[in-house]
Amino acid sequence: MSQTYNVTLLPGDGIGPEIMAVAVAVLGKVADQFGFAFNFQEALIGGAAIDATGQPLPEATLAQAKDSDAVLLAAIGGYAWDNLPRSQRPETGLLAIREGLGLFANLRPATIFPQLIDASSLKREVVEGVDIMVVRELTGGIYFGKPKGIFETETGEKRGVNTMAYTVGEIDRIAKVAFETARKRRGQLCSVDKANVLDVSQLWRDRVMAIAVDYPDVELSHLYVDNAAMQLVRSPRQFDTIVTGNLFGDILSDIAAMLTGSIGMLPSASLGSDGPGLFEPVHGSAPDIAGQDKANPLAQVLSAAMMLRYGLDQPQAADRLEDAVKKVLEQGYRTGDILSPGTQLVGCRQMGEQLLSILDEM
């Protein structure tokens, strides 16, 4: 009897419904090819949820997501909700669903597609063959540590305080995700910290080394964050999988992303210890082109591939989707954001049709 996966779809706002439609179509195709099935159920989040219910994350959406095998999100936000109080904006729905699902590990790949290599701001010989996965701790560190705030000292001077703190449990669980991720890739993990000056980073390094004992097949190295940032630009091919804390990961994942030259091609995943993961493209909702069939659906398709690989344990189906994306680029099809001389401009729907045609031939 074939496996059926329950997947919550969160099309969200802007171009979200358009790119989600492409992802659903290609997922259905690879499911047929590999002998499993999907039960897709849509739910509201972000601006669409605010308009319908007054809340960026309705309770019904979170409940449905918790009962799913995986959650696939498209895009959140737009100009229409920019004047709302910060706590009521669409983006708070994303933070709330991450918290509600207990997601603490953010996986951000940065892969150079040979057909798009000239979009990178770095020289071809530097970025050719780059394939990096940044595993960022998502719920701890300086963004969440306490005490925090702006206080007045005894002399009347204002003082801003944030606290970078990690527990052993928080470090151990992100380290395990990173080692498991590296094991599924090329077996190399670089832990990034600032252990030469920060006590919290010394604990980080100690715990990562302790967890490494359980992963003898993964080669572990360490870099200080300033050197890691430099090496990402100087010699990015040396990296396979990187694991780091929330603040450092926030910065390094964006550096790694821009090696590729096109944010419209970048997927991501957020995972927890158990329960469903959340899979979404890195790009925004692009309200300026929404409903015009101009959106690039490839990051959404690659997010669906990450869902297959890291959320549903269907690595062969994930490979198939990723290969289809490479093939469609090889054939010269481009949406406007990645268009270059000698390539063919297509819309979102046609890009999806080309992917389906390629999958039929694979």
From Swiss-Prot:
The record marks Y143, K194 as: Important for catalysis. It is an enzyme of class 1 (oxidoreductase). InterPro entries: IsoCit/isopropylmalate_DH_CS, IsoPropMal-DH-like_dom, Isopropylmalate_DH. NAD(+) binds at residues 78-91, 284-296. One of its GO terms (cellular component) is cytosol. PROSITE patterns: IDH_IMDH (PS00470). It catalyses: (2R,3S)-3-isopropylmalate + NAD(+) = 4-methyl-2-oxopentanoate + CO2 + NADH. Mg(2+) binds at D226, D250, D254. Binds 1 Mg(2+) or Mn(2+) ion per subunit. One of its GO terms (molecular function) is magnesium ion binding. Pathway: Amino-acid biosynthesis; L-leucine biosynthesis; L-leucine from 3-methyl-2-oxobutanoate: step 3/4. SMART domains: Iso_dh. Its EC number is 1.1.1.85. Substrate binds at R98, R108, R136, D226. GO terms for biological process: L-leucine biosynthetic process. PANTHER family: 3-ISOPROPYLMALATE DEHYDROGENASE (PTHR42979:SF1). Catalyzes the oxidation of 3-carboxy-2-hydroxy-4-methylpentanoate (3-isopropylmalate) to 3-carboxy-4-methyl-2-oxopentanoate. The product decarboxylates to 4-methyl-2 oxopentanoate. Homodimer. Belongs to the isocitrate and isopropylmalate dehydrogenases family. LeuB type 1 subfamily. This is 3-isopropylmalate dehydrogenase. It comes from Synechocystis sp. (strain ATCC 27184 / PCC 6803 / Kazusa).
